[in-house]
Amino acid sequence: MKPVRRGQTDTALDISSHAKTNGDFIKKMNTTDSKRLKLLEDLKGKLEVECKIRDGAETLLQVFDTNFKKETKERKEMLKKKCTDELESSKKKIEELVSSIESFQGENGEAKTGSTSLTRSASATVSRKSSLQEKYSTRFSYKAGCSDSCSVTVSGTGELIGPTRNAHSNLTPTVIQRIDFENVNEKNNSSSEDTQPNGKRPSSLQSNFSQFPLNPWLDNIYKACLEGSMKDVIDSSNNLCEYLHEHSDPAYAKNFSLITPTILSMLELNVSEVTASVYRLLRHLFLDATAFSCCQMLNLPWILSKSLLSGTDAYQIEREQAFRLIRTLYFLSSTEGHEDYLSGITRTIISICEHVSDVSRGIAVETLIELMIIRPKILFKANGLRVLMISLIDGSISENLAASAALALVYLLDDPESACYVNLPYDIGILLSPFTSSSSRDTFNSSEEQSEQAAKAMKSSAKVASVLLNSWSGLLALSTNDFQALRSIVDTLRVPSFAPRSDVIDLFFLIFQVEYSSWSESFLAGKRLTVVKNQAVSNDDNINMVNIPDGSNKKYMSLRQHFTAVLLFIFLELGLVESIVCMIRASDDPSASRKATYLLGEVLRLSDELLPIHLGAKIQSLPSLFNMASQFTAEDRFVATSVLQSIESLNRVKFHSATQPFSQTTSLLFKEQKTDGSFRGQRQVEHVKLKMGMQIDDSHFRSMLAETNVLATKNYQKWRWDTLVQIMEGPLLSPKRIDETLRTTKFMRRLLAFYKPFSNRFSSIQNTKPNQKFIKVGCLVFRTLLANPEGVKYLSESKVIKQIAESLSQIDGYSEQVSEPIFSNSRLQKTLTHGYFPMLKVLSSQKEGHAIMERWRIFTTLYHLTELRNRDDLIIIFLTNLDYRLEGHTRIIFSKALNTGQQAVRLTATKHLAALINSESANDNLNHWAISLLIFQLYDPCLEVCKTAVKVLNEVCARNENLLAQVVQLQPSLAHLGEIGSPLLLRFLATTVGFHYLSEINFIEHELDNWYHHRNIDYVDLLEQNFFLSFVSNLKIIDKKNNEPDENILPLHFYGELVKSPQGCEVLESSGHFESFMGTLVEFYDKPLGNEAIRQLKSALWAIGNIGKTDQGITFLINHDTIPLIVKYAENSLIPTVRGTAYFVLGLISRTSKGVEILESLHWYSLMSLMGTSQGICIPRHAGQVLSTPRRNVEFVNERVPTPEFSSLLSSLTNSEREVIRLVSNLSNHVLTNESARQLTKIRSKNAKVFSSKRLVKACMTILGKFHYRVQIQQFVFELFPYSVLLSSSTSQDLNESPSRPNNLSISA
């Protein structure tokens, strides 16, 4: 049931009649003459009421559909009918009243008044009622957690009373609530009076106010304030907020003088919920910088500060809305005067951040974080940056909020103009203090609660440090003053008595993004390491692919690996390895020693993978450990040998488990094949074992058959399945053995009987990981039988194939349906029934198997299954488990499903084509067929399928040049896909055939102009966005999504693909674009740049880098002597992200042999593989060449010097007021606080009038805005002054003191 407003019916449209008919008034005409004039006034008043009802009804009908769109159709018709009836009734009554007035005036000889002016007259303002001074007992409630459109609601009976976006939100007040007859007379009597601060509007505003669009709402609010109806005040304010939310108009901001009296009347009530409504209303009204004029009229900073300092739960709504309004003011501030105006509020928020137990501390921290991004100068002037940093690492806020603040700090440091507000390295060193200060853990040893707080502080600091160290801005900031901050972290590992050393190790795990696995957790727990070979399970939805950005078969390191390389190199130069060894030698904690050993092993692995041999050789040799281990008389020899053995065991286990921490990408398409020497050797060993198994003698063979227990029992749980695998992979591959087994034993018959679907043995086994061995053995049985003609004959006559066919026909829609089919959805999920499809894959891999499937009409059944619309799960299973190397029914079935299946089927089948192309058994025929289907999928009606097909073809072309040539020969049309097909077309540029094809369709000319003017900058934005999203996801700041772009994949660049062909190089040279990029680099070097100039510079760097990463494009860089200039950018640029971009670009250039040579001459070393090919990573000889930055001194802003205005204000104060100022100033002194507070309390008790001085309150508020005070002190100062004084300077006369909040002048020391 919807809430009902006070004085309304449940529909808010059933308006009661206040006027009587014309006949009623004719009867009154016979009264005495003394009553005639009063009756005439009554008629005019009622006519005015009816005019307002008519106007309101007309307005409501115009916006009816908008305001009542959430109502049901029947209710809307009923409400609309009532509104129409009321409109007609009002018009009829107006006619009667006008006729009566004209007749009555005619009888008295009065001049007639035109009906138009009578019907359109507006009521004047009303005087304040005495009820304003009464205390209100209404109970308030608030809907917490609301958005920008949330409402403050009030109820006197405990019910939640609207409006919060309900059907009555925007009703015109005159239609919602009738005006009483007595109020009309009172308003008419007071219309000529000026409204003073005691509740009257100035007469000079009457004409403008009557035409103001917000007049109905403001008038209703104003009247409710005078009547003291808190519910009506809040309801009307909510209605106005709803209107402003949907009809915001900057013109309203120019009429603040019309709005201010209503706002003041609300503030004078001094009720928390009404004040919250004021803040919400102002937030909707403030649209630009003109809002600060209204702030000055209302003394808004003082009121807001008082609201923020109201620490009890009763003021929660008010504080929340105050913070929202303050954020709006921060966003709208645009001048230095605005920043100074907000300094007092900012210092109040800073003091709240310092107060750990304050309930609003979290939102105060968030506000300062937002302020650091949009207006850092305000925060700097209030000395709030250091307070904010301390609050991030004290453990009182969440890790994610601390990480978000670190991201904001990174944003601040990236801009040279805003970075000057950070005092490096001291301000940023605060964030690392929990790891470098010995008191960080010792101070919390007194209680369990404080120890938990210390642990939270460590986690928050680690999160913040990892964010900073994984960004260029943060890394450069921490490298200031010869890596002072980073060096202190590394050196803490050398201090034996330093308690948080284990936390420092955890910090390095987070910095290098070391992933834990089951075996690593076992090692850290002190358990013995066991080697478990990883059995790769093919999964099309989670297949890895290395970064192949240039379209060749070469594998290059990603941008993330490039960044990790320089980060690792810095810590190695700072002595990380030696510090870890010192910690291991001196640690008495076995757990900490194991953790340090594991970190040492990961550091060695990363240095081997990411650092050039020139830089990593010394680290890999571990001189200190080997020296300790080789000295037999040393006490630490056992420790050294134990560490070396542990590292060797870790590397061995890691190798056999085949973990690849850097190769996990979001590619859904490819799996890196194992082609290393160990895998080839393993295959050779297996081949030898297979040959030896086929040559065993008869007795050994019979013994193996007996060991399986198949001949002894039908209970499959007693069978030796490992022995069965050995027999299938060895002896039974011999024609002699299989023939003998089939003729003389029941071995194969009993084995196949186990797999019959209708026997409910294999088909009823639960689908668990250990039970997957039954599927593997079943596939081996089918493969073994197909390897021999006798086995093929036996299998074709076996009932197992027949029953599989019959089971499939149970659901094909053409046969008789059964209640519980074998291949039901539930059985596929819960049992091993899905294992029959891998067995069918074995059959479909050979011609003999095709013949068996044709005999039992399995292909016909599969054709029928593709037509099902409610079994996508089944279709997907058999499509992904058939073999398509042979031409025939399998390919036709796949093509049919690809064309006519549901969207999920088509999408999965498109992805499966990529797995087929990448499979080990793929041949040219299969690849050509798969590519032709992928081309066809480019025209699928589903956009997601098209995107997947483009992605598959793009990665296919990047992986194999022969497949790229096949795709180009088919000449697919991608015009209908727009930007989605651009990456695939860019691949075509790498070949001569593709270049000519793109030239014919004018693609090159169009893209050349598009990239030069627009796409170059878009490329920068895309790359940085992908890098950032992956960065915050890896640090678990946000949840990782499946469709999240991967920073490992470098997006294709038009110029990089263009120069891969000779014809493309000619086009680039004739266009003159490279010279333009070079001009940008030369022009912007060592100059202050704006945001657009920075983006343009980055786009030029990436364009040059992508050109220089190819053997043909590097010539352009050599001819223009580009590489030394890029090195200067990497070493000297004042903009961190530009320096990082130049560093990445040098990595691209190092992919060519000529680039490696030039970089080496400039003292930059490139990472080379064992085969002598570059890996796309280059590192300077010394880390200081790129990262070390000089100490930055921040200019101190002294705002404590009195301004002339403040000095003049002080000179006008009386002696008593000056004494108050002196005592308030002393409150900031911890020594004088208590005595000053007592003196101020004494003055207030003896001479309270002194605190009603507007001069004094202005002086005190100015002092609070210039100096730092604790929360308790600020609360105390605000409680000294009556609430009315804070509003007084916005009017021309003193205000009578309104009912103020209870004053509590006692403060704690």
Curated annotation (Swiss-Prot):
Domain REM-1: 24-110
Keyword terms: Cell cycle, Coiled coil, Meiosis, Membrane, Phosphoprotein, Transmembrane, Transmembrane helix
Database matches in InterPro entries: ARM-like (IPR011989), ARM-type_fold (IPR016024), HR1_rho-bd (IPR011072), HR1_rpt_sf (IPR036274), Pianissimo_fam (IPR028268), Pianissimo_N (IPR028267), Rictor_IV (IPR029453), RICTOR_M (IPR029451)
GO CC terms, sorted: cell cortex; cell division site; cytoplasm; cytosol; membrane; nucleus; TORC2 complex
Phosphoserine modified-residue sites: S151
Segments passing through the bilayer: 285-305, 392-412, 504-524, 564-584, 926-946, 984-1004
SMART domains: Hr1 (SM00742), RasGEF_N_2 (SM01303), RICTOR_M (SM01307), RICTOR_N (SM01308), RICTOR_V (SM01310)
Pfam families the record matches: HR1, RasGEF_N_2, RICTOR_M, RICTOR_N, RICTOR_V
SUPFAM superfamilies hit by this protein: ARM repeat, HR1 repeat
Membrane topology qualifier: Multi-pass membrane protein
Sequence segments annotated as region (Disordered): 105-128, 183-205
Assembly and interaction partners: The target of rapamycin complex 2 (TORC2) is composed of at least bit61, pop3/wat1, sin1, ste20 and tor1.
PANTHER family with a match to the protein in the record: CYTOSOLIC REGULATOR PIANISSIMO, RAPAMYCIN-INSENSITIVE COMPANION OF MTOR
Record protein name field: Target of rapamycin complex 2 subunit ste20
Source organism of this protein record: Schizosaccharomyces pombe (strain 972 / ATCC 24843) (Fission yeast)
